[in-house]
């Protein structure tokens, strides 16, 4: 079990706000994050395939 001081330190607000990481809002994945949509590439692909993201469709050229 952690010391009470270590628990308080972990729960304290961060000293530097820049250290925050972007994570997917659906699954919490830290990599492959698409800032415009706020989700990772895998969740984006699934939602786009089901047509749940308005304005997104499969590209063809």
Swiss-Prot record:
Keywords (A to Z) from UniProt: Metal-binding, Ribonucleoprotein, Ribosomal protein, RNA-binding, rRNA-binding, Zinc
Cofactor: Zn(2+)
InterPro entries: Ribosomal_uS14, Ribosomal_uS14_bact, Ribosomal_uS14_CS, Ribosomal_uS14_sf
Cell membrane is among the record's keywords: no
Keyword DNA-binding in record: no
PROSITE patterns noted in UniProt: RIBOSOMAL_S14
Cited SUPFAM superfamilies: Glucocorticoid receptor-like (DNA-binding domain)
GO MF entry, a single one: rRNA binding
Cofactor descriptive note: Binds 1 zinc ion per subunit.
GO terms under cellular component: cytoplasm; small ribosomal subunit
Residues given in the record as Zn(2+) binding sites: 24, 27, 40, 43
GO biological processes: translation
Any one Pfam family match given in the protein's UniProt record, by short name: Ribosomal_S14
NCBIfam families, alphabetized: PRK08061.1 (NF005974)
Role played: Binds 16S rRNA, required for the assembly of 30S particles and may also be responsible for determining the conformation of the 16S rRNA at the A site.
Subunit structure: Part of the 30S ribosomal subunit. Contacts proteins S3 and S10.
Family membership noted in the UniProt record: Belongs to the universal ribosomal protein uS14 family. Zinc-binding uS14 subfamily.
The protein's name in its UniProt record: Small ribosomal subunit protein uS14
Species in which this protein is naturally found: Desulforamulus reducens (strain ATCC BAA-1160 / DSM 100696 / MI-1) (Desulfotomaculum reducens)
